[in-house]
Regions:
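Short beta-strand-to-loop element that shapes/binds the nucleotide-sugar donor at the catalytic cleft/hinge
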Residues: 57, 133-151
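Glycine-rich N-terminal loop/short-helix segment of MobA-like nucleotidyltransferase
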Residues: 1-30, 44-46
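Catalytic-core segments of class I nucleotidyltransferases/pyrophosphorylases
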Residues: 102-103, 110, 114-127, 141-144, ...
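Conserved N-terminal catalytic core of the sugar/cofactor nucleotidyltransferase
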Residues: 1-7, 33-106, 110, 186-189
Length: 238
């Protein structure tokens, strides 16, 4: 089982304004609990021992919150002088990881486990010889707080295909994944999206469809929907 992870937490959270004018988005509370604590607890519940958290916007506030957190996982900060986006942020932190796969979790989602913890399912499906990344996907029709047109199709052979600009896809990327550092071979410097690397290496990107719930807390509408879902499903495994 993978013991190391990264939590993406450096962005400006512009879609969550005005809440994020005073605090970084990872500290926005969902039923009284900061978003990032849902992500960290999700990792800890799966046995992950260490989480690298990238920070930039209102970094001091985020880091102060993390510094007084006493529960697992152990936190290591990767401060960014400029926002590096998803790809650049992870590449900037690779020095903190071994040459081995690690989990990555976005800090603006709440992932509710199904019968088997989602991270365990990802690890069971990981094929180091065939994969550089393994994405946890979710059915668009079952997503909470997500209003987009999906990201991927998965064929009967398990092969991923991105939707075209005109299409609507049945599966959305949850922001939860396994990445191997070799995905970043010959990658750009500075700020860039992970989508650049997915598109370049799609044949080595796998997928698992999540069997639990997924709450996308991208804006205030998503926040309200997430809180309503959690109130209605109090016995769900967080």
């Amino acid at each position: 089982m993978i013991k190391k992870s990264m939590v993406m937490a450096a962005g400006f959270g512009t879609r969550m304004r005005p809440l994020t004018l005073q605090i970084p988005k990872p500290l926005v509370q969902v039923l009284g609990k900061p978003l990032i604590d849902y992500s960290l607890d999700f990792l800890a519940d799966a046995g992950v021992e260490e989480a690298v958290v990238n920070s930039h916007y209102l970094a001091e506030l985020l880091e102060a919150h993390l510094s007084v957190r006493t529960s697992k996982p152990k936190i290591i900060i990767s401060r960014e002088n400029a926002v590096l986006e998803t790809g650049g942020g992870i590449k900037n932190a690779l020095k903190l990881f071994d040459d081995a796969p690690f989990f990555v979790v976005n800090s603006d989602v709440i992932c509710i486990n199904g019968k088997t913890p989602a991270l365990h399912r990802l690890w069971q499906a990981w094929d180091d010889a065939e994969m550089d990344a393994l994405l946890l996907l979710h059915k668009v029709e079952d997503a909470v707080g997500y209003e987009g047109r999906g990201d991927f199709f998965v064929g009967d052979d398990g092969v991923l295909r991105r939707r075209t600009q005109q299409e609507t896809a049945p599966l959305v990327f949850t922001g939860v994944q396994i990445i191997h550092p070799r995905l970043f071979t010959d990658s750009p410097d500075g700020a860039f999206s992970l989508n650049v690397l997915y598109n370049k290496n799609l044949a080595r990107v796998g997928a698992v469809v999540h069997d639990g719930a997924w709450l996308h807390v991208g804006d205030q509408t998503g926040l309200t929907q997430a809180e309503n879902w959690l109130k209605t499903n109090k016995n769900s495994q967080l």
